[in-house]
Amino acid sequence: MKNRLLEKRALDSRLTSPDVTAKEKWLGYLLGPSGALLLNAVLATYLNVYYTDVLNLTTVWDGAFLAVFPIVSKIIDAVTNIVMGYIIDRTRTKQGKARPWLLLSAPLVAVTGILLFTVPSGNRTVQVIWVMLSYNLFYSFAYTIYNMSHNLMVPLSTRNTEQRGSLSVFNQISTIMMSGIIVALIFPMLIMPQLGVDKSKWIVTMSILSCIALPLTLMEYYFTKERITLEGGEQKKDSVAMVTQLKAIFSDKYMIIIFIYFLIFTVGSTIKNISLVYFSNYVLGTYNDGKTQTMLSVIGGIPMGIGIFAVWPLAKKFGKRNLTAIGFIFYAVGSAICWLAPTNMVIVLIGQFIKNIGGLPCSYVFMALFADVLDHVEWKNGFRCDGIAMSIYNTIAVASVGICTGIFNLILSKSGYAAPYTNAAGQLIAVQSASVKSAITFTFVGLETITGIVLAILLLFLNVEKNIAKEQEEIKQRNGETTE
């Protein structure tokens, strides 16, 4: 992106310090991202409810529409992630290479977020076209631009690993606050009962959330700074061919390990999240009892609150890799405890608490560890691969949702899942066989017992931190920057 508009002082970052500042942490990485992250978290949970319960799209194409169009859209989304990574790596502006796209995404996310819900009434064909277009305008266009640039803020913020780790923690706090507290607890208790199936209320509520995202994303833009991009020499370097970047990425053992790590973790956690409702309804609790899922969510949120204060000091002392590996041992043990007694509320809650304690390091310091790997690849090859590497990261996340949903539904089908129904007496019958309950239990706690062990072992080979300080100094000297 080359534009005279970006040369204007009015668009300069409000940060001038070479070191990370307090206002950068609080405004750029905690408060700023919260608007777009809140909107995305709400959509991830409730957009499908709007499609099925408010618009009644389950009848379109005999039910095939809502099964096919999200999968096709995710394929489009995966492609646009790769394209966006390519574009970011070739962006040269005074404001950096990712921040300009963060600025552009602010109005785009707000407008397309509103379009998702302002579906015209009446003609069904028009509704279907509107849904397909608005869904892809948001996810494959606007939010892809935001998410790619947002995720690169930590890796591009500074080479100081301690400061970068601190930003990673603040960034993750914002994510957890939006999805783990507001969407998982406040929204279902206070907001959803008021919305019901009233389309106008849905439009007003979601439009407000979309509009809130605009000023907060602008705040994120103004209170972030790409110190690495703006280093001496970085902006003067010629663009590197995409094939060359891909070769650099996939010939580096640390990058391969971290992508495998992210893939395994994402598959396990995604299938677990999909199965949460089913586990609450059929194994641990009863159908829509209104308390089981909330209790599991609360237990999941408590360790995340504790982790705000504990994780980074421990990561500095023991190392990001080491702490994360130890965490995954607790992750596996906690899941195994739940697996042993999946119908006992007390035991499951204890197991979930232990499991979520173990998941703290991967939640809070992963992006800092990923940033170390990006620096290592730069040291090794002489050029950065931020955009294309992040596009692969995002593609894994995007593709996993569709694939994991398909895997979970296949497991349910093969185990003999029976949909709830109302009998002649007007009673809701929601009963599953032992094989179905066993399958649901495996997807909720069994799979993560296995992935926890695998990830703990895999991380033993990710010793990128060992020489990262030395490599960063060599990069600075190579770029003509004075060593601090």
Feature-to-residue mapping (PLM):
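Membrane-embedded alpha-helical bundles of multi-pass transporters/translocases
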Residues: 2-484
